[in-house]
From Swiss-Prot:
This is Lysine--tRNA ligase. It comes from the Bacteria. It comes from Dichelobacter nodosus (strain VCS1703A). Mg(2+) 2 binds at E416. GO terms for biological process: lysyl-tRNA aminoacylation.
C-alpha cells in the first residue's frame, strides 16, 4: 500500500469512527462518562491470580478493569477482548450476549480497537489457561477517533515515535519500560542524596546573567521589568550562593537549556543533577559518584556489568586519568608538542580537520585535542582529571600546579556523563577569571561567561571549602536502558516542525 493509500484508508476509518461518536451523541447518552472506578490493574490480577486455582479465582469476587482495547475478536454471541491499562499489561475479557442485554452487546460490537472501556466481572481461566474476566457489565468511556498502528508492523517510523510519543507508549512496551526506568533512576538519586543529609532545593530558571557553564543561552524578555532574561544553562552559581548562606549540602534535579545543536547526545532542554558539598574536594565527589553509579546499576539492572550498544560496561571499577596522560596515551603524536602551540594548531588541522586559528594557549589547545581524539575512546568509566585552568573558570586551582585545576569529567561509553571540581572560593581570583571570560565574550566567544558581580559579592562573604558536581540525567538513563539516542529517553524531544 502506497503512502497516499495509507492516508486515504486512515481518513476513511477516522470518518467512520466520527460517525459512531455522533450516533452516541444523538442518543442523548453521555459521550465521555467520568464515573468509572476500576478496582484492579491488569498487572495486579496477573500477579495475584495467574497461578491461582479455581478456589482462588472464585474468592477474588468481582473485579473492575478500565483501559484501552488493544484487540477484539467477535464470534457471534461471544467475543474476546484484550484491555491494556496503566500497568502496561493486558488482561483478557470474555464478553457474551448471555451476560449482557442484547442492546449493550450490539453496541459493544460496534466499538473499535483503541477505544477506552470499563468492564467488571469474575475471574476464570480459559481452556488454554489464560486468565480472563467473565464480563457482566461493560461500558464505553472514550471513543478513539484514530486507529492504532497496525499490530503486525507496529510503530516503526522512529520520527513518528518521537513526535507522537503518546502513540509510541500505547503500542511499545519497550518505550514504557525506558520511562519507568527513568523515573526509578531519578527516585533513587533523590533518596541517595537525602540519605546523606543533602537538602533538595529549587533555583531560578530565568537568569539576569547567563553563567555556570560554557554554552550559548536562550534569551527572552521580561515585559514588566523591560529587561532581557536568559533560560538557565546551569544552576551552579545559585547553588553555591546557598552554600555561602549556610546550606552545606544541597542538590537540585531540574532542567537546563542550551541554545546549541541537536544530536544523538544533545537536546536543547535536558535534565541535570547538580550537588554541592562543603568541606569536601573533588576526590570526595569521585568516591561518592562511584557509590552512586554502582548502586544505580545494581538497583536498575541487578548488576554492575551491563551491555551498552554491544559493549560491556563495568561499573565495578572507575579509572582516574590526568588529561595530559590521556592525550599522550590516545594521541601519541601529541606527546612531545603539548608546550608548542603552533605545532598543536597544526596537529588539530592535519589530524582532526579543526581550524584553531591563531590560538596560542596550550591549555586550550590540549583540551581541543582531547575532545577530538580521546573522548570517544573512553568506553569504560574514566574520571579525566587535572583540566587546564584556562578552560575551568569556576574551578579551584591545584595547589602544586596553578595551571591546572582540581576538576574531573566522567566519561562512559565515549560520552561525558558528569563534570565536577573543587570549587573556586577565592573571590579575587574569581573576579579576574570572570573578567577574562567577559573579554572573550566581547571578542566573539558566544559560550564565554559574563561577569556576575553578585556572585563575586557572595564569595566575598566567604564560601567554605566546597566541591560540586553535575550529572547529565538523560545520558545516564541512556546508559542504563541501552538507548542509542537521547531522544529515546526524553518523552517529548525537540524536533523540527513537521
Amino acid at each position: 500500500m502506497s503512502h497516499n493509500e495509507k492516508i486515504q484508508d486512515e481518513n476513511k476509518l477516522i470518518a467512520e469512527r466520527r460517525q459512531k461518536l455522533q450516533k452516541i451523541r444523538d442518543t442523548q447518552k453521555i459521550a465521555f462518562p467520568n464515573d468509572a472506578r476500576p478496582t484492579h490493574k491488569a498487572a495486579q490480577l496477573h500477579r495475584d491470580f495467574d497461578h491461582g486455582d479455581e478456589a482462588a479465582l472464585s474468592q477474588a469476587g468481582t473485579v473492575a478493569i478500565a483501559g484501552r482495547m488493544m484487540g477484539k475478536r467477535v464470534m457471534g454471541k461471544a467475543s474476546f477482548v484484550h484491555v491494556q491499562d496503566g500497568s502496561g499489561e493486558q488482561i483478557q475479557l470474555y464478553v457474551s450476549s448471555d451476560a449482557l442485554t442484547e442492546e449493550v452487546y450490539e453496541e459493544f460490537k460496534t466499538w473499535d480497537v483503541g477505544d477506552i472501556i470499563f468492564a467488571s466481572g469474575s475471574l476464570f481461566r480459559t481452556k488454554t489457561g489464560e486468565l480472563t474476566v467473565q464480563t457482566n457489565a461493560i461500558r464505553l468511556l472514550t471513543k478513539s477517533l484514530r486507529p492504532l498502528p497496525d499490530k503486525f508492523h507496529g510503530l516503526t517510523d522512529q520520527e513518528i515515535r518521537y513526535r507522537q510519543r503518546y502513540v509510541d507508549l500505547m503500542v511499545n512496551a519497550q518505550s514504557r519500560d525506558v520511562f519507568k526506568a527513568r523515573s526509578k533512576i531519578i527516585s533513587y538519586i533523590r533518596h541517595f542524596f537525602e540519605a546523606r543529609d543533602f537538602l533538595e532545593v529549587e533555583t531560578p530558571m530565568m537568569h539576569p546573567i547567563p553563567g555556570g557553564a560554557a554554552a550559548k543561552p536562550f534569551i527572552t524578555h521580561h515585559n514588566a521589568l523591560d529587561m532581557p532574561l536568559y533560560l538557565r544553562i546551569a544552576p551552579e552559581l545559585y547553588l553555591k550562593r546557598l552554600v555561602v548562606g549556610g546550606f552545606e549540602r544541597v542538590f537540585e534535579i531540574n532542567r537546563n537549556f542550551r541554545n546549541e545543536g541537536v544530536s544523538a547526545r544533545h537536546n536543547p532542554e535536558f535534565t541535570m543533577l547538580e550537588f554541592y558539598q562543603a568541606y569536601a574536594d573533588y576526590n570526595d565527589l569521585m568516591d561518592l559518584s562511584e557509590v552512586l553509579f554502582q548502586g544505580l546499576a545494581q538497583t536498575i539492572l541487578g548488576t554492575t556489568k551491563f551491555d551498552y550498544q554491544g559493549t560491556e560496561i563495568d561499573f565495578s571499577q572507575f579509572r582516574r586519568l590526568p588529561m595530559r596522560d590521556a592525550v599522550c596515551q590516545y594521541v601519541p603524536e601529541a606527546a612531545n608538542i603539548l608546550e608548542d602551540a603552533p605545532k598543536m594548531v597544526q596537529l588539530l588541522k592535519e589530524k582532526f580537520h579543526i581550524d584553531a586559528g591563531n590560538e596560542s594557549d596550550c591549555g586550550k589547545l590540549m583540551t581541543m585535542i582531547f575532545e577530538e581524539g580521546v573522548e570517544h575512546l573512553l568506553i569504560q568509566p574514566t574520571f579525566v582529571i587535572e583540566y587546564p585552568a584556562v578552560v575551568s573558570p569556576l574551578s579551584r586551582r591545584n595547589d602544586e600546579n596553578p595551571d591546572i585545576t582540581d576538576r574531573f569529567e566522567l566519561f562512559i561509553g565515549g560520552r561525558e556523563i558528569a563534570n565536577g571540581f573543587s570549587e573556586l572560593n577565592d573571590a579575587e581570583d574569581q573576579a579576574e577569571r570572570f573578567k577574562e571570560q567577559a573579554a572573550a565574550f566581547e571578542a566573539g566567544d558566544e559560550e564565554a561567561m559574563h561577569y556576575d558581580g553578585d556572585f563575586v559579592r557572595a564569595l566575598e562573604y566567604g564560601l567554605p571549602p566546597t566541591a560540586g558536581q553535575g550529572i547529565g540525567i538523560d545520558r545516564l538513563v541512556m546508559l542504563l536502558t541501552n538507548a542509542p539516542s537521547i531522544r529515546d529517553v526524553l518523552l517529548f524531544p525537540h524536533m523540527r516542525p513537521e
